[in-house]
Amino acid sequence: AEVTRFMSDEEKKKVVDYMEAGRRYLGQMDLNIKSPLVWEFYDNTLKTLAGYGAKIVRLDAFAYAPKEPGEKNFLNEPGTWDLLEKVRKLADKYNLTLLPEIHASYGEKNYEQIAGKGYMTYDFFLPGLIIDALESGDGKHLFDWAKELIEKDIHTVNMLGCHDGIPLLDLKGLLSEERIQNLIDTVVGRGGYVKDLHGQKNMYYQVNATYYSALGEDDAKMLLARALQLFMPGKPQIWYLD
């Protein structure tokens, strides 16, 4: 940091280019779930997390794990559920609760599948529903969602913002396309950036913005949004960059 104080932007760029030359990035790595070594790794990881005091463990993008040639390789059945059950047996040894993470449209009802098998699920619908309600002045969809969670006894972890941004894909089938587009236009107009579904153009996935920015940096709206989150069914997750 001290050195860069005396460097021009062009000089800094040359240093970065030099450091990055020839570097290759692996990205997210698939693990061979058929290997005993991988399951030994999973067991050790869960044991370590429990030793640090963890109670709930998020399984990031778990639905992509079981892959087979010729399959869609997203939520393959029964492979996905068999894998999840195998991980749960490991987690039970250490008194850990699993939180499977999955993004899919409301209409696909994957959240019901997860809940029906006895797992907690992320409420990725709530962030968009609150923005829709506050900006449109119509809270019916938010009310109906809260009612559904209670009536179907779905146990969730909810949030406003998160490191993935504000979910959009999840809202398909819950809000009309017009209302989703209005939400997108509102947040983008306040500095947000829409990320499309991987490999597809013009298929919205999420909008990147802090929740405070998405609400127009309005303190009253942010306070109300947080109150709604805290009193919704489910465990509230407070993200430090909301």
Residue ranges of predicted features:
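Active-site and adjacent substrate-binding regions of carbohydrate-active enzymes
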Residues: 1-242
